[in-house]
C-alpha cells in the first residue's frame, strides 16, 4: 500500500483509539468520532480520485451528510446529559434517577 | 250625546298625569306615592261610569283619535275600542292596582327610590290600558312591548342581586320568543288582509287562518307562560311583592289570554287551533300544579298557582268559551292579587322570610292576614259562592259537558284537585302549628295602608264574582242541564284534594325527611325543564366546539399523530428492551481490547 493510504489509515486508527479510550468527558469521544469521519472522508476521496472511480464520486458527499446527522444526534445526547447534571462527565451516566 | 267617550278618555288621561309631572318638583316630594294612588283611585271611579252605562244599555264605542300615517293602502291611526272586554276589564284592573299601590306604600316605604317605583307601576298600568283598549294590532303591540319592558324594569328592581338580573333577562327573552309569533301574525294580516284593524280582520273572509292563529298562540305562550315558555314566571318572583301581585298575577300575564280572547271570531271556526290551545293549556295547568306541590318559597307557590290558572284559561278558550275565560280573568285578578299581598304581609312581618318551612303559628299573631289568606285560597279553589266559583265551576261544567278531548279534560280535573292540595300546603305550613320563626321579631300588622288595601280586595274576593256575573250581558249560554255527578265534579275533586293534602300534612308532620324520591325531585326541580333548556344547550355547543376545534384539530392531528407518537413509541420500546447499565468506558475499552487481540492473534494466516 502506498504511504498516503497508510498515513490516513493511521489517522483513522488514532481517532478510533481516542474514542474508545477516554477518561471523563463525553465530549472528547464525540470529537474523536468527528476525526474518524474526517479521515474516512479523505481516504475515500483519494481512492476514488486516484483510481478514477467516477461513478462513486457521490459517496464522500453522502458520507458527509450522514456524519452531520450523527454529530447532531451525539451533540443532542450530550446536551441532554449536560442539562441534567451540569457537566458531561461520563460517570453521570448511571441508572440513578436523580 | 252622552259622556261615554269623554269619561273614558278622562280616566285614561288622569292616569298619565303623574308621569307628566315627574319632571317637576312634585316628583321629589315625599307625598308622590300618595298622589299616584289617589290618581289611580279617581281613574277607577271615573271609569266605573262608562262601565255602568255599558252594562245598562250595551253601548260600545270606538274612539279613533289621530291619524298617524298611511302606508300605501293601509291606514294607521290611534283608536280605542271600548267594547265588552275592555269596559269590564278596565275597572277591575284599576281597582286591583289601586289596592296594590296602597299596599306598596306600606311594603316599600323604606325604599329610597319609592317615587321611581310608583312611576314604573303607573307606566305599567298605562301600557296595560293601551293593550286592552287597542283597536288595531299596532297599538296592541305597543302595549304588549310596553308591559314587557316594564316587567323587566320592575323584576330587576333590586338590581344589585344577580338572581334578580337573571330573572329579568329571562322574562324579556321568553317574551321575545312569543313576540316572534305576534309579528308573524301582523305580517300575515298585512299581506293577506291589508289591515291591522280588528274590525276589518273579522269581516274579511279567508279559507284558512291557521298561520296567524298559530302566531297568536305562540305570542300567548310567551306572554302567559304556557308550557314551553314558562320558566320566567317563577323566576320573576325575584321582584318585590307588589310587582308580583300586579304584573304576574292579575294583569300582565293575562295579556296573552286576552289577545286570544280578542281574536275569538277567528278562532271559533278553526278546530285545529282550538285543539292545540286546549292541549297546551291542559299540559300547562297540570305541569305547573305538580311543580307547585314541592316548592318551599311562598311566592313561588303562588306564582305556579297563577301559571296553573292561566293554563285553565287557555283550556277555556280551547273549548270555545272566550267569555268564560274573560270572566275567569276578572275574578282571578281579585283573589290572586290578594294572595300575593297576604304573602307580602307575612314576609315583611317575619323580617323578609320567604321559606314556608320557617313560618308557622301565624294564625294567632296575624289574624287579619290569616283570614284573607284563607278566604283567598278558598276562592282560588272554587269554594261555592265565593268569587272563584262563578268562573271556575262554570268552566269545569262546560268542559265536562262538551265534546272535547277526554285526556285534556282529565288532566284539568287532576290539576283542579292539586290546586286544593298546594293551597292547603300554604295554609298548613304558614299559618297553623307551632311557630318556626325566630322569636326576636316584633310582628305588627296594624298599619291602615295594609289593612285597607287587603280589606278592599277581600270584599272583592267574596262578592265580585256574584256582582260581575249577574251584571254582565248574557253571552254564550251556559249548560243548564247535566247529570248530577258531572255537576258535582269540580266540588268533589277539590274536596278530595283538600282532604288528601290535610291528611298527608298532618301525618308526616313529625317524620324525618328521607332521601327524596324521583317524583319529588321531578316536582321540585320544576320538571327538569329549566335545567335542560338553560344549561344543556349552551353546554352542548361549548363542548362540541371544544372537542372539534381544540382537541380534534389542534391536539390530535397537528400535535400528537406524528411527532409525539413517534417519540413516545421510541421511548417506551427503548426502556422496554434495554437492560444496559450505561458503563460506556467499559464497553469501549473491551471493544478496543477485542480489536487489538484479534489483530494480534489472527495475524498469522497463511
From Swiss-Prot, chain A:
<dbReference type="GO" id="GO:0005743">
    <property type="term" value="C:mitochondrial inner membrane"/>
</dbReference>
<dbReference type="GO" id="GO:0008137">
    <property type="term" value="F:NADH dehydrogenase (ubiquinone) activity"/>
</dbReference>
<keyword id="KW-0830">Ubiquinone</keyword>
<comment type="subunit">
    <text>Core subunit of respiratory chain NADH dehydrogenase (Complex I) which is composed of 45 different subunits.</text>
</comment>
<keyword id="KW-1133">Transmembrane helix</keyword>
<keyword id="KW-0520">NAD</keyword>
<keyword id="KW-0813">Transport</keyword>
<dbReference type="Pfam" id="PF00420">
    <property type="entry name" value="Oxidored_q2"/>
</dbReference>
<dbReference type="InterPro" id="IPR039428">
    <property type="entry name" value="NUOK/Mnh_C1-like"/>
</dbReference>
<protein>
    <recommendedName>
        <fullName>NADH-ubiquinone oxidoreductase chain 4L</fullName>
        <ecNumber>7.1.1.2</ecNumber>
    </recommendedName>
</protein>
<comment type="function">
    <text>Core subunit of the mitochondrial membrane respiratory chain NADH dehydrogenase (Complex I) which catalyzes electron transfer from NADH through the respiratory chain, using ubiquinone as an electron acceptor. Part of the enzyme membrane arm which is embedded in the lipid bilayer and involved in proton translocation.</text>
</comment>
<keyword id="KW-0249">Electron transport</keyword>
<dbReference type="GO" id="GO:0042773">
    <property type="term" value="P:ATP synthesis coupled electron transport"/>
</dbReference>
<keyword id="KW-1278">Translocase</keyword>
<dbReference type="InterPro" id="IPR001133">
    <property type="entry name" value="NADH_UbQ_OxRdtase_chain4L/K"/>
</dbReference>
<keyword id="KW-0472">Membrane</keyword>
<feature type="transmembrane region" description="Helical">
    <location>
        <begin position="29"/>
        <end position="49"/>
    </location>
</feature>
<keyword id="KW-0679">Respiratory chain</keyword>
<dbReference type="GO" id="GO:0045271">
    <property type="term" value="C:respiratory chain complex I"/>
</dbReference>
<feature type="transmembrane region" description="Helical">
    <location>
        <begin position="1"/>
        <end position="21"/>
    </location>
</feature>
<keyword id="KW-0999">Mitochondrion inner membrane</keyword>
<feature type="transmembrane region" description="Helical">
    <location>
        <begin position="61"/>
        <end position="81"/>
    </location>
</feature>
<keyword id="KW-0812">Transmembrane</keyword>
<keyword id="KW-0496">Mitochondrion</keyword>
<comment type="similarity">
    <text>Belongs to the complex I subunit 4L family.</text>
</comment>
Amino acid at each position: 500500500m502506498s504511504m498516503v493510504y497508510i498515513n490516513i489509515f493511521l489517522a483513522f486508527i488514532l481517532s478510533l483509539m481516542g474514542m474508545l479510550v477516554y477518561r471523563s468527558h463525553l465530549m472528547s469521544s464525540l470529537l474523536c468520532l468527528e476525526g474518524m469521519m474526517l479521515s474516512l472522508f479523505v481516504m475515500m476521496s483519494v481512492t476514488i480520485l486516484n483510481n478514477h472511480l467516477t461513478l462513486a464520486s457521490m459517496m464522500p458527499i453522502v458520507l458527509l451528510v450522514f456524519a452531520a446527522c450523527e454529530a447532531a444526534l451525539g451533540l443532542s445526547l450530550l446536551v441532554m446529559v449536560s442539562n441534567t447534571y451540569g457537566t458531561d462527565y461520563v460517570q453521570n451516566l448511571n441508572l440513578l434517577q436523580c | 250625546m252622552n259622556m261615554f267617550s269623554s269619561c273614558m278618555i278622562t280616566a285614561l288621561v288622569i292616569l298619565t298625569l303623574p308621569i307628566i309631572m315627574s319632571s317637576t318638583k312634585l316628583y321629589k316630594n315625599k307625598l308622590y306615592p300618595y298622589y299616584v294612588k289617589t290618581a289611580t283611585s279617581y281613574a277607577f271611579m271615573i271609569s266605573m261610569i262608562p262601565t255602568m252605562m255599558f252594562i245598562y244599555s250595551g253601548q260600545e264605542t270606538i274612539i279613533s283619535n289621530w291619524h298617524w300615517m298611511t302606508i300605501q293602502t293601509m291606514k294607521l291611526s290611534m283608536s280605542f275600542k271600548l267594547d265588552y272586554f275592555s269596559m269590564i276589564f278596565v275597572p277591575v284592573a284599576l281597582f286591583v292596582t289601586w289596592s296594590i299601590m296602597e299596599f306598596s306604600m306600606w311594603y316599600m316605604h323604606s325604599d329610597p327610590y319609592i317615587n321611581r317605583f310608583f312611576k314604573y307601576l303607573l307606566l305599567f298600568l298605562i301600557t296595560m290600558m293601551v293593550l286592552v283598549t287597542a283597536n288595531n294590532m299596532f297599538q296592541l303591540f305597543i302595549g304588549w312591548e310596553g308591559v314587557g319592558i316594564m316587567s323587566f324594569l320592575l323584576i330587576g328592581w333590586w338590581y344589585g342581586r344577580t338572581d334578580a338580573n337573571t330573572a329579568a333577562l329571562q322574562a324579556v327573552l321568553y317574551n321575545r320568543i312569543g313576540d316572534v309569533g305576534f309579528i308573524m301574525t301582523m305580517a300575515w294580516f298585512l299581506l293577506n288582509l291589508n289591515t291591522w284593524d280588528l274590525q276589518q280582520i273579522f269581516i274579511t273572509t279567508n279559507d284558512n287562518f291557521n298561520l296567524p292563529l298559530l302566531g297568536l298562540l305562540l305570542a300567548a305562550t310567551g306572554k302567559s307562560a304556557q308550557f314551553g315558555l314558562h320558566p320566567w314566571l317563577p323566576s320573576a318572583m325575584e321582584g318585590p311583592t307588589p310587582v308580583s301581585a300586579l304584573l304576574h298575577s292579575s294583569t300582565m300575564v293575562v295579556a296573552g289570554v286576552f289577545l286570544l280572547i280578542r281574536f275569538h271570531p277567528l278562532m271559533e271556526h278553526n278546530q285545529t287551533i282550538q285543539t292545540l290551545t286546549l292541549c297546551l293549556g291542559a299540559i300547562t295547568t297540570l305541569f305547573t300544579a305538580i311543580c307547585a306541590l314541592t316548592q318551599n318559597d311562598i311566592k313561588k307557590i303562588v306564582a305556579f298557582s297563577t301559571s296553573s290558572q292561566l293554563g285553565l284559561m287557555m283550556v277555556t278558550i280551547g273549548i270555545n268559551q272566550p267569555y268564560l275565560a274573560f270572566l275567569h280573568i276578572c275574578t282571578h285578578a281579585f283573589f290572586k292579587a290578594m294572595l300575593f299581598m297576604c304573602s307580602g304581609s307575612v314576609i315583611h312581618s317575619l323580617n323578609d322570610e320567604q321559606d314556608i318551612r320557617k313560618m308557622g303559628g301565624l294564625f294567632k299573631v296575624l289574624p287579619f292576614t290569616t283570614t284573607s289568606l284563607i278566604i283567598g285560597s278558598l276562592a282560588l279553589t272554587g269554594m261555592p259562592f265565593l268569587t272563584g266559583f262563578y268562573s271556575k265551576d262554570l268552566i269545569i261544567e262546560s268542559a265536562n259537558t262538551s265534546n272535547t278531548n277526554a285526556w285534556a279534560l282529565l288532566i284539568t280535573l287532576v290539576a283542579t284537585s292539586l290546586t286544593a292540595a298546594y293551597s292547603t300546603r300554604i295554609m298548613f305550613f304558614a299559618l297553623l302549628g307551632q311557630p318556626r320563626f325566630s322569636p326576636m321579631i316584633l310582628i305588627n300588622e296594624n298599619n291602615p295602608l295594609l289593612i285597607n288595601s287587603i280589606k278592599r280586595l277581600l270584599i272583592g274576593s267574596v262578592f265580585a264574582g256574584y256582582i260581575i256575573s249577574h251584571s254582565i250581558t248574557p253571552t254564550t249560554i251556559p249548560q243548564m242541564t247535566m247529570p248530577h255527578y258531572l255537576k258535582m265534579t269540580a266540588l268533589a275533586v277539590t274536596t278530595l284534594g283538600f282532604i288528601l293534602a290535610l291528611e298527608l300534612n298532618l301525618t308526616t308532620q313529625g317524620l324525618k325527611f328521607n332521601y327524596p324520591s324521583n317524583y319529588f325531585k321531578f316536582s321540585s326541580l320544576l320538571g327538569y325543564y329549566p335545567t335542560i333548556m338553560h344549561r344543556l344547550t349552551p353546554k352542548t355547543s361549548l363542548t362540541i366546539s371544544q372537542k372539534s376545534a381544540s382537541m380534534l384539530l389542534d391536539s390530535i392531528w397537528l400535535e400528537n399523530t406524528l411527532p409525539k407518537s413517534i417519540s413516545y413509541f421510541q421511548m417506551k420500546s427503548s426502556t422496554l428492551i434495554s437492560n444496559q447499565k450505561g458503563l460506556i468506558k467499559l464497553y469501549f475499552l473491551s471493544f478496543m481490547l477485542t480489536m487489538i487481540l484479534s489483530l494480534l492473534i489472527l495475524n498469522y494466516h497463511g
